[in-house]
Amino acid sequence: MNITHVPEIHRTDKQHTENLRHWRKILGIAPFVSIVFPAIMYFISDEDSFKKSLLLRFITILLPFSYSAVQYAILLHTTPYYTLNLLFLAFAAISILSITALPINEWKGDDSLIFSIVLPSLFIPPTYLLSTSCRLVPGQTAFTDTGINVLIDILILLCPLVSLVLVCKEPEYRLLSAVPFPILILARLLNDRYCPSEKSAPPTAPWRVAILVLILTSAALIYAFMMWTPIAILNGYFGLLHKLRESFLSLRPD
């Protein structure tokens, strides 16, 4: 009886391997699409369209914030560190909160540019690096890429800084925020396909741990900055902060 089930088990394992391969391909191209799609929506829509259409606002921000929420949910599931789990849970919650809050507020002035191009260019790079270039397991917690991917990843890590510099410039320069990261993602994908390099093996070098700390710090600062916009929007609509304050005061002893 066991022998008759061997082909079925083999097919099941093979199908599982194929599904994992397809899933990795989707996750590999997802950050590229998450930057490019909102930028395309910005270029093909005018300011009045964003102001009037809640659906357009929702579609524009859905991909980048969904990518963020999904990646941190995966990291939350696979990371054994309690502190990092709390951090990833907060990042995922901020992403979901942004999907809920940002579309319900009318976009005025540069809001469409900020939400469709500038914001994704800030939070997607560290999210991508944490999910693809870092190992978060005991004894091996560090940045793991080698070869040319190290240079590409360092440039990706600098993308949010470039975006912040461009935000201070004229609006036409802010559009450039959507350019560096997709180009680097394509370079990374091509390199992985035609010149694959191995991940570093433990013990990890101090500089690899330092890069991981930089990525985590960058992500924490960016999401701490991001969370105030959806909170302010929800507070304006539902008095969220006032209700939280009342709940807190009701728990205090007289």
Curated annotation (Swiss-Prot):
Listed name of the protein: UPF0328 protein ECU01_0070/ECU01_1540/ECU02_1570/ECU04_0080/ECU08_2100
Superkingdom of the source species: Eukaryota
Pfam families per UniProt: DUF2463 (PF09591)
Protein family per UniProt: Belongs to the UPF0328 family.
Source species of the chain: Encephalitozoon cuniculi (strain GB-M1)
